[in-house]
Amino acid sequence: MANKTVEKTNPDTFLKEMNEVCCTKVTEEDLKDAIEDEYRVMYSRDGKKLLKASFSFRKKKYVVREGTEVICDDAFRQCGSLQSITIPNSVTSIGDFAFYLCESLQSITIPNSVTSIADYAFFSCESLQSVTIPNSVTSIGDFAFCRCKSLQSITIPNSVTSIGDNAFWLCKSLQSVTIPNSVTSIGDNAF
């Protein structure tokens, strides 16, 4: 994502500009101007935000468009047929609940461009067996992988400093966790 200077002058203007820079929330304006791909996945007009997969989304494998920078909150929420997703290196943010209840999702590689894993990002992805967390990630959010019942092992890279509350709670198959010395904060019921 390119650097952008935001001046704090008018509070309304400031909030609007901050939303454009870093927000993973979908706005009414985003939806009004959205474009839809052949699989009924909506993107912002400029292609930088993946907004939402439609309720009729039934793909087993999906490749996020190159140039996408943000996978918004709830983007693939409850897409029960999704088994595999390819995320390009252009993505810097994965929003809250982005893959919430994607019960068929089996594996995911998070690109080196992502710096944090948001709250509930992969909550209850019950078929998720493997996750690759890159060295760019510094924090793992609350409930990020909670109820990923098939997850067997996880290696947390040296870049991570905090693991949120319930991040890996109810991961019943989890047998091995490697936590580096860089982690200074582990939330309640993290494992």
Predicted stretch roles:
Residues 72-75, 95-98, 118-123, 141-146, ...:
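Consensus positions within tandem repeat domains that build extended binding/scaffold surfaces
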Residues 40, 52-54, 58, 98, ...:
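Homeobox/homeodomain signature
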Residues 1-48, 54-70, 80-93, 103-116, ...:
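Structural signature of tandem-repeat unit edges
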